[in-house]
């Protein structure tokens, strides 16, 4: 799994040093022979010349998908994806983006998810199960209100998607229930686009999972251009974990070490291009999730078991 895959195209890129590099990471992932590849958003980077036209949007997808280093991975395993702002439109875009239906249409054509929305609910939303792990893939853009709205309670998921998520989690019989969403959830700091910028909905999500007694929940997120594992202790029940994994080939956020996320598990901050593996083991009733994070060459940087 990974997020933030920027593929250079000089004619459309910013001047100076190319933003994307380290494409060999895709071969390193391929060499691990994963059963599935989970793309955590910003899987493409729409440029200013792309997001206003169908031609531009489809060019960006085909340009990214044509990368030679990507071909073995694309052809060798199952792929599931969520979207984030750069898949949808401009940087930090929200549900007000005028062309979101066209970018959603392109997402549907280039990703083979089981569904794109649930019933009449629109967006890049779906779920799938792999063994005793179930994945709930959310859309954090389609219903999102702009940060800083003052006359309404802001939302990332919207009521319909929020209610569906809680119902689906409650109904799930899976040992591991992964909530997959672009931006960080547990980090309590309201920085950039973390869920903490939407405090009412953020609190309601954590409280509802706790009050409903939903077992086995963990968050998988991208976006931040660094990797870390966060752990939220909860009174009387198991802790919630969040694995943030980023970037694949985009630039690295140099300020991550000084961002004092109080929930960060010591020794898990990674400030280089990387990907993560999730491995499941153990007998029924005694299952273990092992997380390992690897650099662009495939070298293991850290591992933790939950």
Predicted regions located by residue number:
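Metal-dependent phosphoester/phosphodiester hydrolase catalytic core
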Residues: 1-306
